[in-house]
């Protein structure tokens, strides 16, 4: 009898223990599934520059580890969204200035992720090989040269049949890092431009019509006979628009290409804060209007977001650079990749960026 009672107790206790173990196992499994799903659902929101948008959108489409929504709004809107902490990261073709950085409570890490050129695309029927001197393209955007057969344009385009066609300048209508790059260059080469118009993401244009973002300007140029405007090279390429060879600091006429923009970047040394302004580069073969373009990161994120940010940057520095040239951008030099990786690796202690 005693043995039977003990067996019953053993059975009951064993059943209870099994039930408890099963319950703990289920809870642990469910919690693990929930945690795994939570990891998979990390989403990042970014906004800003339209200049690198085709490249970034390609990266984020191909990159499967993190869901990234990048909204191409223009650098001005991107910096504003980033400063107000409405996004997880921003993007700008012009590095943030000290007074802008001071407004960001979580700190700022600026990472140059690619580079490219600002070209002067045009729509002049029958003209595919156009050269523009520094003085001429400044005067076009000042509104002083008004016609395509102007003597100053003809003088540097011997043998080109320039039509009697009004020039229509097309510029950005939104806050734009591309505008910042272009007007900084014009201010560097022309005292008149610097005093009358100046530089910035938005300026008071002396002449012309506006278009939103790089693709909007490209569309306007394509639509307007006699149009000329400044856009990132890839947008001109996609729109099938010819671009002018521009006179550089050494006096040579240079078209935008992988080699000429690499020559420009080679003449520029990035400082420790990774902020560089390329207003009028040296070098006989340098293309005169080129820029790095930056992702803007906070110094502090919560655990999952910080890891996701580092994974996104790692992808951009590795696989992302391989498709840059295909879309008209310039892959980062290896020394720049290493510097960017080291800076980005400070964002999260839970992940280490590895370059391939």
Where are these regions (language model features)?
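N-terminal secretory signal peptides that target proteins for export/translocation
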Residues: 1-13
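Assembly/oligomerization scaffold segments
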Residues: 7, 27-28, 86
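Glycine-centered signal
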Residues: 12, 30, 35-37
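Flexible loop/hinge segments at secondary-structure junctions
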Residues: 35-356
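Bacterial N-terminal signal peptides
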Residues: 16-29
